[in-house]
Amino acid sequence: MKRVVIVGGGLGGVAAALAAARLGVPCLIISECDWIGGQISSQAIPPDEHPWIEMTGSTASYRSFRKRVRDFYRSNYPLIAAARNKEALNPGLGNIGPLAHEPFVAEMVLEQILAPWRSRGLIEILRGWKAAGADVQGDRVRSVTIRNSEGVEQEIVGDYFLDATDLGDLLEVAEVEHVIGAESQAQTGELHALQGPADPRDQQAITWAMALRLSPHTDNVIPRPAQYDRWRTYQPHFWPGPMLGWQVSDYVTHESRYRPLMLNEPDSSGLFYDLWHARRVLAAEQMEGGWESDTTIAAWPMMDYWEIPLLGGNTNDTAKALQEAKEFTRSFLYWMQTEAPRHDGGTGYPELRPHGEATGTPDGLAKMPYIREGRRIQADFTVVEEHIGVAARPGKAGAERFRDSVGIGAYRMDLHPSSSGRNTLDLDSWPFEIPLGALIPVRLNNVIPAGKTMGTTHLTNGAYRVHPVEWATGEAAGALAAYCLQSKTTPRETRDQDFQLEDFQSVLSTRLDIDLHWPEFGALTPLRRFGYVQTAAS
């Protein structure tokens, strides 16, 4: 029997395992992918972080991860002195945030972090397995059945089961009460929720990212994708031009904006408002010795796929959606290589080369798609817009302060276009807390969400889904499972009984160095988010 079984090897799963191990409880990670880390590694998405991340607003273990990434570059790359000596080294100088790094580096660093705990037998990892069933007895899960790509199955018995998958795989097989898609205003009372009925199909777009480099004077054009003709002229009704193009819909105003691959000059803020610099994860200018090329991650607005929702249909629908998302990315690459207007005149960038070394794949595409939302538990407490949204909290100067806080985070409610045909929704939010009640399912006693499956709504998921918050949620979940085992209590009892809650929060703050409340900071408005505008000082 395994004490803590973590289904999913993403950031939340890694953080959960690390927390449980640090508290002395052995655990098992069941990872569908051979790379652990999820969005930061196998999905090839560099960190989406808030403006204060270098000072506060993350757990000590997440800060340690960030430091180790920077140390990896200092130890292994020929950095110029100015870059090497910068405490807040940003390997890629990407506009997305202060730490844009290569996906494979994140994976290696995470492996290094877990290595001593694996050596001690406190963490075990099974790779290439996915939840396929569960044995539920009463209000407890006794075991999960996992299956690999060859159809081989095995049963895993445990005390606590954590769902750290993007889609909520454990929630499905264990029949945990959950929600998909967008809730209605009648259900949640949220200011920006749907005014009509709830829409399970209203699921955010997924993105199949890829890594790219430039090899001047070479021809790297990929074979013409089978679906290229379809995607070449594809234009949703709310988009300002064909998706295979340089016009995008502004994430806040929905006005048309020109976003080419490259620009010759920066804008008035000093940043290049182009695609190449958006998620650049390695900047050649920071390397000695004539480094051949930058490396950038293509995970751009025009690459969002939402035609078929991943959830609510059948297995064939999901498989088709994933295949189409990958084909859409290939089509965008082919368009850039052959037909795209160039910043220096002419058409096509044949010198664009997929960089599989960064993603661990032969074609340069990420190992896994970036999935923004999946199943969310029906929780004892659900975080709604009125807890964190600026417009939804008139006259208040911060987010809701939760008695049962188990961590903190910050991001705007950033919703990408959805499968129901809705455009982006981007809402100001206050730096927020993670309530323990959002980690407790309404029925099952030994299932804990360890990431995006927590008790949020369609709206608040848009803020709680990002890297440092997923890490913090997973860390709290792993600590909760360990605490309940050692204290012979349950998650619900831990929350409901004041002395138990205070004891658990003391474990979080003293043994794991997790902040439970924010200092006072301003709201995350369009001028206070990393992206393509300068961030204002706090």
What are these regions (language model features)?
Residues 1-10:
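Beta1/beta-strand and adjacent pyrophosphate-binding region of the FAD-binding site
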Residues 19, 26, 31-129, 133, ...:
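Conserved N-terminal/central alpha/beta ligand/cofactor-binding core
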